[in-house]
Amino acid sequence: MKLALLTFGACLATTATAQSDWLTTWDGMLYGYGKHSVLREDSILNPGNRLAHLPERSAVGELRLNLKAESETVRLTARAIATWQNRADSAATQQSDDAYLSQWQIRLRATEGWHVAAGRDVLSWGPGQFRSPSNPFYFDNGRRNPMRELVGMDSAKISWTPDMQSSASLVHIFSSGHSTSQDDPWRAGWLAKFDRRGDEWALGLVALKAPDTPAFYGAYGQNTLSDALLLYGELGSSTQPVALQSPADISQPFTVQANSPRRTTALLGAAYTFENSQSLSVEYLHDGHGYTAAQENSYFQRAITQPGIALGQAPRLLGRDYLHLVWQSNLMAETGYWRLMFSRNLNDHGNELASYGETVLSPKISAYALAVLPQGNARQEFSALVQRSLTLGLKIALP
Protein backbone atom coordinates (compact mmCIF):
# COMPACT_ATOMS: atom_id res chain seq x y z
CA MET A 1 0.00 0.00 0.00
CA LYS A 2 2.89 2.37 0.73
CA LEU A 3 4.14 1.65 -2.80
CA ALA A 4 0.71 2.62 -4.13
CA LEU A 5 0.93 5.96 -2.32
CA LEU A 6 4.32 6.70 -3.83
CA THR A 7 3.17 5.62 -7.29
CA PHE A 8 0.08 7.80 -7.21
CA GLY A 9 2.08 10.79 -5.99
CA ALA A 10 4.60 10.25 -8.78
CA CYS A 11 1.77 10.12 -11.33
CA LEU A 12 0.45 13.46 -10.11
CA ALA A 13 3.89 15.05 -10.26
CA THR A 14 4.67 13.61 -13.70
CA THR A 15 1.33 14.67 -15.13
CA ALA A 16 1.68 18.19 -13.79
CA THR A 17 5.18 18.48 -15.26
CA ALA A 18 4.23 17.11 -18.66
CA GLN A 19 1.17 19.31 -19.07
CA SER A 20 1.77 23.02 -18.59
CA ASP A 21 -1.98 23.73 -18.49
CA TRP A 22 -2.53 21.48 -15.47
CA LEU A 23 -3.30 23.00 -12.09
CA THR A 24 -1.95 21.16 -9.03
CA THR A 25 -2.86 21.82 -5.42
CA TRP A 26 -2.40 20.07 -2.10
CA ASP A 27 -3.28 20.56 1.54
CA GLY A 28 -3.42 18.42 4.63
CA MET A 29 -3.96 18.04 8.34
CA LEU A 30 -1.68 16.53 10.97
CA TYR A 31 -3.47 15.05 13.99
CA GLY A 32 -2.11 14.04 17.36
CA TYR A 33 -4.45 12.85 20.10
CA GLY A 34 -4.81 10.64 23.12
CA LYS A 35 -7.85 8.72 24.32
CA HIS A 36 -8.69 7.29 27.73
CA SER A 37 -11.59 4.87 28.19
CA VAL A 38 -13.05 3.40 31.35
CA LEU A 39 -14.28 -0.08 30.47
CA ARG A 40 -17.24 -1.70 32.17
CA GLU A 41 -15.92 -4.20 34.71
CA ASP A 42 -19.19 -6.15 34.84
CA SER A 43 -19.65 -6.29 31.05
CA ILE A 44 -21.70 -9.27 29.88
CA LEU A 45 -20.57 -8.98 26.26
CA ASN A 46 -16.88 -8.47 27.03
CA PRO A 47 -16.05 -10.09 30.39
CA GLY A 48 -12.62 -9.01 31.59
CA ASN A 49 -12.03 -7.40 28.16
CA ARG A 50 -11.04 -10.87 26.94
CA LEU A 51 -13.16 -10.77 23.77
CA ALA A 52 -13.17 -7.22 22.37
CA HIS A 53 -9.66 -6.31 23.65
CA LEU A 54 -10.63 -2.65 23.84
CA PRO A 55 -7.78 -0.24 24.61
CA GLU A 56 -7.99 1.67 27.87
CA ARG A 57 -5.40 4.18 26.67
CA SER A 58 -4.29 5.07 23.17
CA ALA A 59 -2.03 7.64 21.51
CA VAL A 60 -2.45 8.34 17.80
CA GLY A 61 -0.58 10.36 15.21
CA GLU A 62 -2.21 10.74 11.81
CA LEU A 63 -1.41 12.60 8.61
CA ARG A 64 -4.20 13.28 6.09
CA LEU A 65 -3.16 14.71 2.72
CA ASN A 66 -5.37 15.94 -0.14
CA LEU A 67 -3.72 15.94 -3.58
CA LYS A 68 -5.25 17.26 -6.80
CA ALA A 69 -4.18 17.81 -10.40
CA GLU A 70 -6.69 18.95 -13.03
CA SER A 71 -7.01 20.22 -16.56
CA GLU A 72 -10.07 21.26 -18.54
CA THR A 73 -11.16 17.65 -19.10
CA VAL A 74 -9.38 15.47 -16.51
CA ARG A 75 -9.13 15.64 -12.74
CA LEU A 76 -6.91 13.44 -10.54
CA THR A 77 -7.51 13.47 -6.78
CA ALA A 78 -6.24 11.47 -3.84
CA ARG A 79 -6.63 11.47 -0.07
CA ALA A 80 -3.64 9.78 1.55
CA ILE A 81 -3.64 8.63 5.17
CA ALA A 82 -0.65 7.66 7.32
CA THR A 83 -1.26 6.60 10.92
CA TRP A 84 0.74 5.49 13.94
CA GLN A 85 -0.91 4.33 17.15
CA ASN A 86 -0.02 2.94 20.54
CA ARG A 87 -2.81 1.02 22.30
CA ALA A 88 -2.68 -0.26 25.86
CA ASP A 89 -4.96 -2.10 28.26
CA SER A 90 -4.33 -3.79 31.60
CA ALA A 91 -2.73 -6.80 29.88
CA ALA A 92 -0.56 -5.51 27.03
CA THR A 93 0.64 -2.63 24.88
CA GLN A 94 0.53 -2.74 21.08
CA GLN A 95 1.96 -0.46 18.43
CA SER A 96 0.91 -0.32 14.78
CA ASP A 97 1.24 1.86 11.71
CA ASP A 98 -0.48 2.01 8.35
CA ALA A 99 -0.48 4.03 5.14
CA TYR A 100 -3.19 3.89 2.50
CA LEU A 101 -5.38 5.88 0.13
CA SER A 102 -8.77 6.39 1.73
CA GLN A 103 -9.91 8.01 -1.53
CA TRP A 104 -8.53 8.45 -5.03
CA GLN A 105 -10.18 9.15 -8.35
CA ILE A 106 -9.54 9.79 -12.02
CA ARG A 107 -12.44 11.82 -13.45
CA LEU A 108 -12.95 12.55 -17.15
CA ARG A 109 -15.40 14.99 -18.67
CA ALA A 110 -16.54 13.03 -21.72
CA THR A 111 -19.05 15.46 -23.26
CA GLU A 112 -21.34 18.19 -22.02
CA GLY A 113 -23.17 16.83 -18.97
CA TRP A 114 -21.42 13.42 -19.00
CA HIS A 115 -18.57 12.37 -16.69
CA VAL A 116 -16.69 9.10 -16.25
CA ALA A 117 -14.72 8.34 -13.09
CA ALA A 118 -12.84 5.44 -11.52
CA GLY A 119 -11.08 5.00 -8.20
CA ARG A 120 -11.88 4.80 -4.50
CA ASP A 121 -14.82 7.06 -3.76
CA VAL A 122 -16.86 7.77 -0.61
CA LEU A 123 -20.37 7.09 -1.87
CA SER A 124 -22.14 9.07 0.82
CA TRP A 125 -25.46 10.90 0.67
CA GLY A 126 -28.52 11.68 2.76
CA PRO A 127 -29.05 14.28 5.52
CA GLY A 128 -29.29 11.92 8.53
CA GLN A 129 -26.82 12.38 11.40
CA PHE A 130 -27.48 9.47 13.78
CA ARG A 131 -27.56 6.88 10.98
CA SER A 132 -28.10 6.89 7.20
CA PRO A 133 -30.78 4.28 6.28
CA SER A 134 -30.67 5.16 2.57
CA ASN A 135 -26.99 4.21 2.27
CA PRO A 136 -25.99 0.52 2.00
CA PHE A 137 -22.28 1.29 2.52
CA TYR A 138 -22.22 3.83 5.36
CA PHE A 139 -25.20 3.15 7.61
CA ASP A 140 -23.02 4.68 10.33
CA ASN A 141 -21.94 7.74 8.35
CA GLY A 142 -19.46 9.03 10.92
CA ARG A 143 -21.28 12.28 11.65
CA ARG A 144 -21.47 11.47 15.37
CA ASN A 145 -17.65 11.43 15.50
CA PRO A 146 -16.06 14.43 13.73
CA MET A 147 -12.63 12.75 13.84
CA ARG A 148 -13.68 9.62 11.96
CA GLU A 149 -12.27 9.06 8.46
CA LEU A 150 -14.56 7.32 5.97
CA VAL A 151 -12.84 5.02 3.46
CA GLY A 152 -14.12 4.95 -0.10
CA MET A 153 -15.48 2.11 -2.21
CA ASP A 154 -13.38 0.86 -5.14
CA SER A 155 -15.66 1.68 -8.05
CA ALA A 156 -16.16 3.01 -11.58
CA LYS A 157 -18.90 5.53 -12.32
CA ILE A 158 -20.64 7.19 -15.22
CA SER A 159 -22.80 10.19 -14.37
CA TRP A 160 -25.19 12.38 -16.35
CA THR A 161 -26.15 15.90 -15.30
CA PRO A 162 -28.47 17.33 -17.96
CA ASP A 163 -29.26 20.48 -15.93
CA MET A 164 -28.94 22.02 -12.48
CA GLN A 165 -32.00 20.16 -11.20
CA SER A 166 -31.32 16.55 -12.17
CA SER A 167 -28.51 13.99 -12.12
CA ALA A 168 -28.19 10.24 -12.58
CA SER A 169 -25.31 7.85 -11.91
CA LEU A 170 -24.48 4.23 -12.65
CA VAL A 171 -21.70 2.77 -10.48
CA HIS A 172 -19.94 -0.59 -10.58
CA ILE A 173 -18.56 -1.66 -7.19
CA PHE A 174 -15.33 -3.66 -7.31
CA SER A 175 -14.85 -3.96 -3.54
CA SER A 176 -15.29 -2.11 -0.25
CA GLY A 177 -11.87 -0.44 -0.43
CA HIS A 178 -9.04 -0.52 2.11
CA SER A 179 -9.00 -3.53 4.46
CA THR A 180 -11.75 -5.28 2.52
CA SER A 181 -12.81 -8.57 4.11
CA GLN A 182 -13.27 -11.66 1.99
CA ASP A 183 -16.96 -11.63 2.92
CA ASP A 184 -17.73 -8.46 0.97
CA PRO A 185 -21.50 -8.39 0.29
CA TRP A 186 -21.34 -5.65 -2.37
CA ARG A 187 -18.39 -6.96 -4.39
CA ALA A 188 -19.16 -6.85 -8.15
CA GLY A 189 -22.39 -4.95 -7.44
CA TRP A 190 -24.18 -2.32 -9.53
CA LEU A 191 -25.57 0.89 -8.06
CA ALA A 192 -28.08 3.20 -9.77
CA LYS A 193 -28.76 6.61 -8.25
CA PHE A 194 -31.06 9.45 -9.29
CA ASP A 195 -31.26 12.95 -7.79
CA ARG A 196 -33.75 15.73 -8.34
CA ARG A 197 -33.71 19.11 -6.62
CA GLY A 198 -35.67 22.34 -6.58
CA ASP A 199 -35.19 25.69 -4.88
CA GLU A 200 -36.47 24.47 -1.50
CA TRP A 201 -36.36 20.67 -1.76
CA ALA A 202 -34.19 17.72 -2.81
CA LEU A 203 -34.93 14.04 -3.44
CA GLY A 204 -32.74 11.00 -4.14
CA LEU A 205 -33.46 7.38 -5.12
CA VAL A 206 -30.97 4.50 -4.82
CA ALA A 207 -30.94 0.87 -5.98
CA LEU A 208 -28.07 -1.60 -5.52
CA LYS A 209 -27.68 -5.25 -6.53
CA ALA A 210 -24.73 -7.62 -6.07
CA PRO A 211 -24.50 -11.22 -7.37
CA ASP A 212 -24.99 -13.01 -4.03
CA THR A 213 -26.87 -10.32 -2.10
CA PRO A 214 -30.57 -9.35 -2.33
CA ALA A 215 -31.19 -5.87 -3.72
CA PHE A 216 -31.02 -2.74 -1.58
CA TYR A 217 -33.46 0.13 -2.18
CA GLY A 218 -33.13 3.58 -0.63
CA ALA A 219 -34.60 7.07 -0.75
CA TYR A 220 -33.83 10.36 0.93
CA GLY A 221 -35.13 13.89 0.80
CA GLN A 222 -35.37 17.24 2.49
CA ASN A 223 -37.64 20.28 2.37
CA THR A 224 -36.83 23.79 3.56
CA LEU A 225 -40.01 25.21 5.09
CA SER A 226 -38.48 28.55 6.08
CA ASP A 227 -35.13 30.23 6.59
CA ALA A 228 -34.96 28.51 9.99
CA LEU A 229 -36.73 25.14 9.61
CA LEU A 230 -35.63 22.10 7.60
CA LEU A 231 -37.46 18.76 7.47
CA TYR A 232 -35.68 15.67 6.16
CA GLY A 233 -35.86 11.90 6.01
CA GLU A 234 -34.23 8.70 4.79
CA LEU A 235 -35.56 5.24 3.98
CA GLY A 236 -33.90 1.90 3.24
CA SER A 237 -35.19 -1.58 2.40
CA SER A 238 -32.65 -4.37 2.76
CA THR A 239 -31.63 -7.75 4.10
CA GLN A 240 -28.59 -8.40 6.29
CA PRO A 241 -25.88 -10.83 5.06
CA VAL A 242 -25.63 -12.32 8.57
CA ALA A 243 -28.31 -11.85 11.24
CA LEU A 244 -28.18 -13.08 14.83
CA GLN A 245 -31.69 -14.17 15.77
CA SER A 246 -32.58 -13.66 19.44
CA PRO A 247 -36.10 -15.00 20.15
CA ALA A 248 -37.96 -13.39 23.03
CA ASP A 249 -38.49 -16.88 24.46
CA ILE A 250 -35.32 -17.41 26.51
CA SER A 251 -35.66 -21.19 26.23
CA GLN A 252 -34.77 -20.92 22.52
CA PRO A 253 -31.09 -20.53 21.51
CA PHE A 254 -29.28 -17.99 19.38
CA THR A 255 -29.41 -18.78 15.65
CA VAL A 256 -27.36 -17.18 12.87
CA GLN A 257 -29.29 -16.58 9.65
CA ALA A 258 -27.77 -15.79 6.26
CA ASN A 259 -29.62 -13.16 4.20
CA SER A 260 -32.16 -12.21 6.83
CA PRO A 261 -35.77 -11.32 5.92
CA ARG A 262 -36.21 -7.96 4.18
CA ARG A 263 -36.83 -5.13 6.61
CA THR A 264 -37.35 -1.38 6.36
CA THR A 265 -35.30 1.24 8.20
CA ALA A 266 -36.48 4.86 8.30
CA LEU A 267 -35.26 8.13 9.76
CA LEU A 268 -37.27 11.34 10.19
CA GLY A 269 -35.62 14.57 11.25
CA ALA A 270 -36.06 18.30 11.71
CA ALA A 271 -33.42 21.00 12.09
CA TYR A 272 -34.04 24.51 13.40
CA THR A 273 -31.48 27.30 13.05
CA PHE A 274 -31.64 30.10 15.62
CA GLU A 275 -30.85 33.76 15.00
CA ASN A 276 -27.38 33.32 16.54
CA SER A 277 -26.68 30.60 13.88
CA GLN A 278 -26.75 27.77 16.41
CA SER A 279 -28.94 24.85 15.36
CA LEU A 280 -30.94 22.06 16.98
CA SER A 281 -31.65 18.78 15.18
CA VAL A 282 -34.10 16.11 16.35
CA GLU A 283 -34.16 12.66 14.71
CA TYR A 284 -36.20 9.50 15.15
CA LEU A 285 -34.90 6.22 13.72
CA HIS A 286 -36.77 2.93 13.31
CA ASP A 287 -34.55 -0.01 12.34
CA GLY A 288 -36.53 -3.07 11.31
CA HIS A 289 -33.41 -5.22 11.70
CA GLY A 290 -33.08 -4.44 15.41
CA TYR A 291 -34.51 -6.30 18.38
CA THR A 292 -37.71 -5.58 20.27
CA ALA A 293 -37.35 -4.83 23.99
CA ALA A 294 -38.09 -8.48 24.83
CA GLN A 295 -35.64 -9.79 22.21
CA GLU A 296 -32.89 -7.45 23.43
CA ASN A 297 -33.45 -8.56 27.02
CA SER A 298 -33.16 -12.21 25.90
CA TYR A 299 -30.02 -11.29 23.92
CA PHE A 300 -28.22 -10.14 27.07
CA GLN A 301 -29.52 -13.12 29.04
CA ARG A 302 -28.11 -15.58 26.46
CA ALA A 303 -24.87 -13.57 26.30
CA ILE A 304 -24.07 -14.57 29.88
CA THR A 305 -23.16 -18.05 28.64
CA GLN A 306 -22.39 -17.19 24.97
CA PRO A 307 -20.64 -13.78 24.97
CA GLY A 308 -18.53 -14.63 21.93
CA ILE A 309 -21.42 -15.10 19.51
CA ALA A 310 -23.40 -12.28 21.12
CA LEU A 311 -20.59 -9.77 20.57
CA GLY A 312 -19.20 -11.14 17.31
CA GLN A 313 -22.54 -11.47 15.52
CA ALA A 314 -24.36 -8.52 17.12
CA PRO A 315 -26.63 -6.54 14.78
CA ARG A 316 -25.57 -3.06 13.69
CA LEU A 317 -28.01 -1.65 16.28
CA LEU A 318 -29.50 -3.73 19.07
CA GLY A 319 -32.78 -1.83 19.34
CA ARG A 320 -35.46 -0.85 16.86
CA ASP A 321 -36.33 2.69 17.91
CA TYR A 322 -34.00 5.60 18.70
CA LEU A 323 -34.13 9.30 19.47
CA HIS A 324 -31.14 11.50 18.60
CA LEU A 325 -30.64 15.21 19.34
CA VAL A 326 -27.82 17.47 18.17
CA TRP A 327 -27.25 21.06 19.35
CA GLN A 328 -24.32 22.73 17.64
CA SER A 329 -22.70 26.09 17.10
CA ASN A 330 -22.25 27.91 13.81
CA LEU A 331 -20.25 25.66 11.49
CA MET A 332 -18.76 28.70 9.75
CA ALA A 333 -17.40 30.36 12.91
CA GLU A 334 -13.70 31.18 12.62
CA THR A 335 -12.82 30.86 16.32
CA GLY A 336 -14.07 27.33 17.00
CA TYR A 337 -16.95 24.89 16.98
CA TRP A 338 -18.89 22.80 19.51
CA ARG A 339 -21.53 20.09 19.35
CA LEU A 340 -23.66 18.40 22.02
CA MET A 341 -25.30 15.04 21.22
CA PHE A 342 -27.90 12.94 23.03
CA SER A 343 -28.97 9.46 21.89
CA ARG A 344 -31.62 7.25 23.48
CA ASN A 345 -32.50 3.64 22.79
CA LEU A 346 -36.28 3.76 23.16
CA ASN A 347 -36.45 -0.02 23.66
CA ASP A 348 -34.00 -0.53 26.55
CA HIS A 349 -34.17 3.13 27.77
CA GLY A 350 -30.38 3.54 27.78
CA ASN A 351 -28.82 6.91 26.89
CA GLU A 352 -25.56 8.26 25.55
CA LEU A 353 -24.34 11.82 26.02
CA ALA A 354 -21.49 13.12 23.87
CA SER A 355 -19.83 16.48 23.36
CA TYR A 356 -17.27 17.66 20.84
CA GLY A 357 -15.48 20.98 20.76
CA GLU A 358 -12.55 22.59 19.02
CA THR A 359 -10.92 25.97 19.43
CA VAL A 360 -8.48 27.83 17.20
CA LEU A 361 -5.12 28.41 18.89
CA SER A 362 -3.44 30.01 15.86
CA PRO A 363 -4.16 30.29 12.13
CA LYS A 364 -2.72 26.78 11.66
CA ILE A 365 -3.31 25.00 14.98
CA SER A 366 -6.54 23.92 16.71
CA ALA A 367 -7.21 21.93 19.87
CA TYR A 368 -10.18 19.59 20.16
CA ALA A 369 -11.88 17.25 22.61
CA LEU A 370 -14.52 14.53 22.44
CA ALA A 371 -16.23 13.20 25.57
CA VAL A 372 -18.68 10.27 25.56
CA LEU A 373 -20.75 9.31 28.60
CA PRO A 374 -23.09 6.31 28.27
CA GLN A 375 -25.84 6.09 30.89
CA GLY A 376 -27.15 2.68 31.86
CA ASN A 377 -26.12 -0.77 33.02
CA ALA A 378 -24.45 -3.81 31.48
CA ARG A 379 -27.75 -4.92 29.89
CA GLN A 380 -28.29 -1.74 27.90
CA GLU A 381 -26.78 -1.13 24.47
CA PHE A 382 -24.91 2.16 24.89
CA SER A 383 -23.36 1.19 28.25
CA ALA A 384 -22.68 -2.50 27.57
CA LEU A 385 -18.93 -2.09 26.97
CA VAL A 386 -17.66 1.33 28.08
CA GLN A 387 -18.55 3.54 31.04
CA ARG A 388 -16.98 6.74 29.67
CA SER A 389 -14.24 7.99 27.36
CA LEU A 390 -12.32 11.21 26.74
CA THR A 391 -10.22 12.19 23.71
CA LEU A 392 -7.92 15.24 23.64
CA GLY A 393 -5.89 16.32 20.64
CA LEU A 394 -4.27 18.91 18.40
CA LYS A 395 -4.51 19.33 14.65
CA ILE A 396 -2.15 21.31 12.46
CA ALA A 397 -3.17 22.56 9.01
CA LEU A 398 -0.69 22.05 6.16
CA PRO A 399 1.09 23.64 4.39
Per-range role (PLM):
Residues 18-116, 357, 370, 385, ...:
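Beta-barrel outer-membrane channel/assembly domains of diderm bacteria
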Residues 72-77, 113-116, 165-168, 198-205, ...:
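Repeated loop/turn-to-beta-strand initiation elements of outer-membrane beta-barrel proteins
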Residues 20, 24, 65-71, 108-109, ...:
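Residue-level signature of outer-membrane beta-barrel architecture
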Residues 53-61, 97-102, 150-154, 186-190, ...:
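Residues that define the transmembrane beta-barrel architecture of outer-membrane proteins
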Residues 28-36, 78-84, 118-120, 170-174, ...:
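Transmembrane beta-barrel strands of outer-membrane/channel proteins
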